[in-house]
Amino acid sequence: GSVVAYCLGITAIEPLKYGLLFERFLNPDRISLPDIDVDFDDEGRAKTLAYVREKYGADHVAQITTFGSMAAKMAIKDVARVLELPIDESNRLAGLVPAKPGTTLEKAFQESEELKNELENGSILIKKVLNMARKLEGSIRNTGIHACGVIIGPDDISNYVPVADSKDSDMMATQFEGKLIESVGMIKMDFLGLSNLSIIKDACENILKSTKIEVEPEKIPLDDKLTLELFQKGLTMGTFQFESDGMKQHLQNLKPDKFEDLIAMNALYRPGPMQYIPNFIDRKHGREEIVYEFPIMEKYLSETYGITVYQEQVMQLSQALAGFTPGEADKLRKAMGKKQIKVMEELREKFINGCAANNYDQAKVEKIWEDWKKFAEYAFNKSHSTCYAYVAFQTAYLKAHYPAEYMSSVLTHNLSDQKKITIYTEECK
């Protein structure tokens, strides 16, 4: 969602063409600073880090420290080890904590009768372990380095944040974590390594060697007939994001005939929105009627056949129906994405009142909001889906036009995964 990033060649996706909203990246109402994610092939990421250090100076660049905290099970095990509780007892107690992500010890004592019984009726040592673990839970346990986060300062980083030498790298590391770094005005850059970009790069080198044809991935036509046929037939094993059995089945039913269909499928094929894939397919092929609550909604939902698929569509509709500013629309998008219930309730009143001021039927408006609340559970942004579909199309194009050279690269980059090697070898046959 940035014209500047497009013009500089940081991204090859033209935001205006695909309706990507700038307000997701920058807007006057945004409180937090944006961060910038850039994907490189594996070799390119290392080169970029070296380039940044050389260009700006080693003392201007730093990786970002992360802090690992004691979760419920680890708190029990750590305290048990220090208090010399036998390891089998330690593992037994930790095993009584429900396996649900984010479960605290307080919740565990409420949900697990066995664990609660140990707290109330266990041995003196077990009670001591559990009570101390309860106090220590959430404490910082260790430090690490953010997998891809880097900050670049206008001068010596230590003028802004405390730094330390990194034990695993020759780059400095901040002693503040990401949120604190943002509070002093530093912007985080994420330099990500994506193996599929390495596969594309090596496949293009294979093609050049065997055919003398130089393929430039950024110039691959996104309406290429042979590539779209490959998607329509579900022959996407070895491609980016579209190789699962479920996705292949949906592609055969959808028969995508334009790049935008692939963007939508990438967003829909996730827990939650998957339930709407049959409706999406039936509406595309005219087997199900496309219904809009208000005529104005067609402008924003026609590309997804009347189904709200992207966060950006909610942003656009909130502006069109209720008169939200672009900044307010992004605030709604963020509240949905991060499940900020309190913020959503505040915006609900503004949305209802704004729609009423524009003479929209309240019952229908209430229904739209309730649909959006459900949508918040799985909301995905179009900017990400477009980028993923773009890389997926490049991989599919190479497979469709140069199968030997492409699959050779796929196999080379999966040599350590016996299961994938078996699957991809079978695909090559």
Cite the ranges covered by each PLM segment.
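Noncatalytic, beta-rich nucleic-acid-contacting surfaces in large DNA/RNA-processing enzymes
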Residues: 1-429
